[in-house]
Amino acid sequence: MENRKTFSWLKEQMIRSISVSIMIYVITRTSISNAYPIFAQQGYENPREATGRIVCANCHLANKPVDIEVPQAVLPDTVFEAVLRIPYDMQLKQVLANGKKGGLNVGAVLILPEGFELAPPDRISPELKEKIGNLSFQSYRPNKKNILVIGPVPGKKYSEIVFPILSPDPATKKDVHFLKYPIYVGGNRGRGQIYPDGSKSNNTVYNATSTGIVKKILRKEKGGYEISIVDASDGRQVIDIIPPGPELLFSEGESIKLDQPLTSNPNVGGFGQGDAEIVLQDPLRVQGLLFFFASVILAQVFLVLKKKQFEKVQLYEMNF
């Protein structure tokens, strides 16, 4: 009898352990599915393809604008701001992974020239820290400090993201030169439509996989639909699964064609990319330019003085 009780207790503990493990896995998987910069980091060695396209566009299919603002020129070993703006209507709600509606998150990738990197905390001024807020930036790869990623973060609070950047010093980094450099940026608002494995998220349109009649629509207990489509020609039945989130456009008994949308498009977000240019300025050139301007001003002053002196001489000769 005691053996049975012991066995029953062990069985109960095993079931609990398995349940807890499954819950941890689901929670972890959900958080990863929302952390879209991770997809690019895991799947691509470089976030910018040879064509110039940033890989985030592979999952975020809608095209939306972004704006990048950087100084025209910076001096070596100087901290400056790179400001990314991701505009969108703050009243919009997106479909979450569970099918409910919620606010949009934003994320970004900033591709700097070689040698430029995230400014260390001790080099960031209090004013700049206030602009950054509670954002936490990370390098795309340990060996790619010039590529920074951020997100997902709440869009209502961080539709404008300020990156603190440290410019390189050619005196200590021999592979860096005083030149004009390009900066590339990509930013998205909202969840993607496709996962890296090619599967669809619930934030996109679902199309019919067969032509026929919608025979039955079964609403699932946890949300979503199971749609039975019967081919009128041969009676073959196809079942399309719709996850929670998208709204159905068809009712039972209606005809439908292959690839015709079964649902509305719930996506309200999108991805955009842009670029800018920045000059790593040589301080000696700046000093030379200032010296040139000063010499021009002095020359003008001496010219005016000489002219007045000449006029006085002419006036004296006329009076004489």
UniProtKB/Swiss-Prot annotation:
Binding-site residues for heme, renumbered to this chain: Y36, C56, C59, H60
GO cellular component, one term: chloroplast thylakoid membrane
Highest taxon, organism lineage: Eukaryota
SUPFAM superfamilies noted in UniProt: Cytochrome f subunit of the cytochrome b6f complex, transmembrane anchor, Cytochrome f, large domain, Rudiment single hybrid motif
One GO MF term attached to the UniProt entry: electron transfer activity
TM helices/strands, residue ranges: 286-305
Keyword line: Chloroplast, Electron transport, Heme, Iron, Membrane, Metal-binding, Photosynthesis, Plastid, Signal, Thylakoid, Transmembrane, Transmembrane helix, Transport
First-listed, main subcellular location of the protein, grouped into a coarse class: plastid
Membrane topology: Single-pass membrane protein
InterPro entries for this protein: Cyt-f_TM (IPR024058), Cyt_f (IPR002325), Cyt_f_lg_dom (IPR024094), Cyt_f_lg_dom_sf (IPR036826), Rudment_hybrid_motif (IPR011054)
Transport as UniProt keyword: yes
Cofactor: heme
Signal peptide residues on this chain, from the entry's feature table: 1-35
One GO BP: photosynthesis
Localisation per UniProt entry: Plastid, Chloroplast thylakoid membrane
Co-factor binding comment: Binds 1 heme group covalently.
Keyword Oxidoreductase belongs to the record: no
Family the UniProt entry places it in: Belongs to the cytochrome f family.
Record text on subunit structure and interactions: The 4 large subunits of the cytochrome b6-f complex are cytochrome b6, subunit IV (17 kDa polypeptide, petD), cytochrome f and the Rieske protein, while the 4 small subunits are PetG, PetL, PetM and PetN. The complex functions as a dimer.
Family annotation (PANTHER family): CYTOCHROME F, PTHR33288
Protein's job: Component of the cytochrome b6-f complex, which mediates electron transfer between photosystem II (PSII) and photosystem I (PSI), cyclic electron flow around PSI, and state transitions.
Protein name: Cytochrome f
Species: Zea mays
The encoding gene: petA
